[in-house]
Amino acid sequence: MHDERIIPDKTPLGIYSIHLKRYEFAKTYMKGKLILDVACGVGYGSRYLSDAGNRVIGVDIDSESIKYAQKRYSSSGQPLFVQSDAAILGINSDTFDVICSFETIEHMRDVDGFLKEIKRVLKPSGLFIVSTPMVSESNINPENPFHNQEWNPTDFQHLLTQYFGDVKVFSQSRRQTKVSKWVKRVDLLDLRRRFIPKVIVRKIAQVTGVRSMDRLELDDVIISRGIIKEASEIVIVATDENNK
């Protein structure tokens, strides 16, 4: 498992909450559906969707992650975890009601091939819910060594409109108060996190009415319609259903 894998028992609460929030958001679009979770990692998100009354197949290219998911999160065959390459799924066409793929597309070398494969296995009326880190400038040489490409919101939306007729853009960000926004604005060099001990950072967060990063819970993370500059991730819900 590489360094970006989220393992609930080992990953800091704040990072886990940020990732799980996308599954909570996706859950609102599904009930009693057949779901594909692409690049499911160790399977915690697939299990979350399965517990909400959906049939879920989680696929990941990493055999270690799939073994962990099968042992930790699968019960009576649900979710079903399968090792598979996201670009070559080996699944029948027009199979799934909803496909989720969170923080995956930026890792893909062949993005167009990946999206064509998603489109192939998704039902004509299906939903594709996808997220990627938000950056101000699109680039093909990211600082993150695990990423092959990154997009700003406009370019990411344009990419998805090449494959889907109806593309809705959302932003994921941390909940903020007026005071916390002011503190962030005046702390241009991010000195709080770079030089101040964690216990003091937590106190500052408490005073400003928010939780510090290491204590974030689901309610501290917001996914809202449109693009906001404070966002850390872009989330898109795409379909062809509304264009028939």
Descriptions of predicted regions:
Residues W182-R194:
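Short, electropositive alpha-helical surface patch
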Residues I129-D155:
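Short, glycine-/aromatic-enriched active-site segment of Class I SAM-dependent methyltransferases
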Residues D112-P124:
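A short glycine-rich, Lys/Arg-flanked "PGG" loop and its adjoining helix->strand segment in the class I
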Residues F102-I105, S131:
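Residues lining the SAM
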Residues V56, F128-I129:
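A short hydrophobic/small-residue beta-strand
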Residues H107, V111:
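Di-metal (Zn2+ and/or Mg2+/Mn2+) metal-binding site signature of metallo-dependent hydrolases
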Residues I140-N144, K178-R185:
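Short aromatic-enriched loop/helix-cap "lid" or pocket-rim segments at secondary-structure transitions
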Residues M1-N92, V98-F102, D112-L115, E150-H158, ...:
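Conserved N-terminal segment of class I S-adenosyl-L-methionine
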